[in-house]
Structure formats: C-alpha cells, structure tokens
C-alpha cells in the first residue's frame, strides 16, 4: 500500500478513486507515564513514555486507514493527513485519513 501526502504519485496514473478512508485510535495515559511526566516537568526534557505512546498510536491509525483502503479495493492512499485531538482528560485521538485510489504504472 502506497501512502503519500501529495495528490498524485510520480510514475503512476490514478485508474479509479475509491473514496475517503480513515483509521483512528484513542490512547490514554497511565499512572506510570503521568508520574514520569510530572518529574520531567520539573527538570525539562522529552517525556519518552508519551512519545512512544503517540508513535504507536500513529502507526495503528495509519494501519487501520490502510485496511479501510484495501477493503475498498485500493492500492494507494493520496492526500494523506494525520490529526490529533483531545477527547477527554488524559486521552487523545489520532486520526489518519486520505483518499483511497487504484493506481497503475505509467
């Protein structure tokens, strides 16, 4: 599955547009990460637990979007975007979205 942020893929023609696709996940913090975050807030620096959590969440959202695209018969996603929002205290949603297309080499 090719996933690009552009509206086209060099060397390929769009054969068919399959439609909007998305994948999302909601991740929450746990007490261990909150304690570490509190300590890092005092001394500064990266909060690795949160960075790892968000990286895993992005990968999962992208994977779910790719599954949605495959279910629609696509072999690529163009116009790919990621968005994050807070859905409640200590919980964030990551959504990956784009346009599913079927492409073929020129």
UniProtKB/Swiss-Prot annotation:
It holds the Pfam family YbjQ_1. It comes from the Bacteria. HAMAP family: UPF0145. Belongs to the UPF0145 family. This is UPF0145 protein BH0643. It comes from Halalkalibacterium halodurans (strain ATCC BAA-125 / DSM 18197 / FERM 7344 / JCM 9153 / C-125) (Bacillus halodurans).
